[in-house]
């Protein structure tokens, strides 16, 4: 255990409190973004049943989420570069968008509203990545690899624990 201590010390050596706070906040936010963006897939069997959807409609929900995310990530990257001082607004907007999307899907009375919610999930995911990565690259110019890899761990943890936690919630409560 003590052999690893110097390596961990080297990992964070020379990084100030503000930088560590930013890295921690963006990593935790990345966890939340991936958790939120994967919730829809976990709820799809229940949405299909409640809204009496076909397999094609369920596939279209996923396509809308991914299509909107793919289309807007390039736009989001352009905006993150154009409005450099608004990085916090982009990442905050991402989390708010994802919360709004899940609310819309949760109260959705129809397939159409579920598609709207899926599109908002795609938009929220697209808002996060360019702004967060730009912020980390600027804050850690000599340690971009370290900062971006720690940020990536947040995504992996969100992807890993999301299904377990959401599955437990769905077992205890309704998907809505």
Where are these regions (language model features)?
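Cytoplasmic helix-loop-helix junction between adjacent transmembrane helices
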Residues: 117-154
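Small-residue-rich segments within alpha-helical transmembrane domains of MFS-like 12-TM solute carriers
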Residues: 34, 38, 122-130, 160
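Helix-loop-helix hairpin linking two adjacent transmembrane segments in secondary transporters
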Residues: 155-176
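Conserved MFS/SLC helix-loop-helix module at the cytosolic interface between two early adjacent transmembrane helices
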Residues: 71-109
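Residue-level signature of mid-helix packing/kink "hotspots" within the transmembrane helices
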Residues: 38, 66-74, 159-160
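Interfacial helix-cap and linker-helix signal at transmembrane-aqueous boundaries
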Residues: 47-48, 79-80, 168-173
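Extracytoplasmic
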Residues: 25-55, 76
């Amino acid at each position: 255990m003590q052999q690893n201590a110097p390596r961990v010390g080297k990992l964070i050596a020379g990084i100030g409190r503000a930088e560590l706070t930013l890295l921690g906040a963006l990593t935790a936010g990345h966890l939340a973004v991936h958790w939120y963006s994967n919730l829809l897939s976990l709820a799809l069997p229940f949405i299909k049943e409640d809204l009496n959807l076909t397999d094609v409609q369920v596939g279209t929900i996923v396509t809308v989420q991914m299509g909107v995310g793919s289309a807007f990530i390039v736009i989001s990257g352009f905006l993150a570069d154009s409005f450099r001082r608004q990085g916090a607004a982009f990442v905050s907007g991402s989390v708010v968008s994802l919360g709004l999307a899940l609310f819309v899907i949760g109260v959705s009375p129809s397939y159409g509203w579920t598609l709207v919610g899926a599109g908002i999930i795609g938009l929220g995911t697209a808002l996060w990545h360019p702004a967060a990565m730009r912020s980390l690259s600027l804050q850690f110019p000599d340690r971009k690899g370290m900062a971006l890899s720690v940020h990536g761990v947040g995504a992996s943890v969100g992807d890993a624990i999301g299904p377990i936690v959401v599955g437990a919630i769905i077992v205890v409560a309704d998907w809505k």
